[in-house]
Regions:
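Juxtamembrane/disordered regions of integral membrane proteins
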Residues: 2-162
């Protein structure tokens, strides 16, 4: 499969890439927001606070509105580097499956973004859910999902563009 990043960039070739990128960022951001909310609510519940389902759903909805912009910015920055790198690497690192390259690149990119953000944040971690290895791993699963979506869409588009 030829690498479509070797071809001339035209508006017709950039537009679908932007939509693929936005789909990956949107999915990762929404999933990550829900994951971090549930991790934080589990910590509150472990301290003995009652959390009825209605409150859990309301808090999740509020975080989708309130946390999503900040997390979306972090995801966007991470994916601006990770996904083009994956698109370039995927056809070149056989025998690794191309979708695995996209998923891994997205997770590594977001993991690095967490590290950079934490280095500059005034508190120990910018996102409370990433205080533990298990919380970080759960958050990175959202990036894996976004990477898989971008990879599947990009590979499908590349077959049609080639």
């Amino acid at each position: 499969m030829p690498c479509v990043y070797d071809t001339a960039m035209t508006l017709a070739s950039i537009k679908p890439r932007v939509w693929m990128f936005l789909a990956a960022v949107g999915l990762t951001t929404a999933l990550g927001s829900v994951i971090q909310t549930q991790i934080n609510l589990a910590a509150v519940q472990a301290m003995g606070a009652p959390l009825p389902w209605g409150l859990r759903l309301l808090t999740t909805a509020q975080d989708l509105i309130g946390f999503t912009p900040a997390f979306g910015g972090l995801v966007t920055g991470a994916f601006l580097a990770a996904l083009p790198a994956a698109a370039w690497l995927a056809p070149r690192v056989r025998p690794l499956p191309p979708l695995g390259v996209y998923a891994l690149a997205a997770a590594v990119g977001l993991g690095l973004a967490f590290q950079v953000a934490d280095a500059f944040a005034p508190m120990p971690t910018l996102i409370a859910a990433t205080r533990s290895a298990s919380g970080t791993a759960c958050m990175l699963l959202s990036a894996v999902a976004g990477g898989l979506v971008f990879g599947a869409l990009h590979m499908r588009w590349a077959r049609g563009a080639a």
